[in-house]
Amino acid sequence: MNLKERTMKLSDNTLNVLKNFAGINNSILVKEGNKLRTISVAKNILAEADIPEEFPRDVAIYDLNQFLNGLGLHSDPDLDFSPESYIAIKEGTRRVKYFYADPQVITAPPEKEINLPTEDVCFQLDSTALDKLLKAAAVYQLPDLSAIGEAGVVKLVVRDKRNDTSNEYAVVVGETDKNFVFNFKVENIKIIPGAYDAVSYTHLTLPTIYSV
């Protein structure tokens, strides 16, 4: 691989993904290629995204927020991955050496891709509905987000599922012929604002497609 192929810029889309991932885990192991993956330290949140850039090598970053804030000191920097132990960040006459972390100290997703079971329930979630749900959870101090299928519809409800008299905010997001309840902690909803196709499985629920 020549020097030019080891130098790249990060698009706004990729920077937004990395900022979102920093909210899940402030350390990241970027693997060679065009897919970013992260997992929370508690290993209860897993996220991945395809990006337009192609990373030329594995990159271990211990403090992702610090790395992103450092990039913010520049307008349009080039990232040179030629050095073995650091990223050379270049713009005009300015140079930064950002040293790689030891991959062993980073909580990273498993190498093996997750094989998901057959989809049980699908519904669309637009950015406005999600934004309102999260704002309502903050206003009413509600810890839980529930996807509930009943009476022919799918609705998302922010509530305190342990308190029958708690305030609730609900929005209908689809139709279904099934009865189900999937519960999340609001604090674990770490997704970039946008429209999603949400897919529910018997043992897990997660948004699977992000529409830019």
Stretches found by the model and what they are:
Residues 1-46, 50-89, 110-159, 167-201:
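DNA replication sliding-clamp ring fold and its partner-interaction surfaces
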Residues 85-109, 211:
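C-terminal interaction segments
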Residues 163:
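Extended substrate/cofactor- or partner-recognition/assembly subdomains adjacent to catalytic sites
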Residues 203-212:
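Single conserved hydrophobic/aromatic residue that forms the stacking wall/gate
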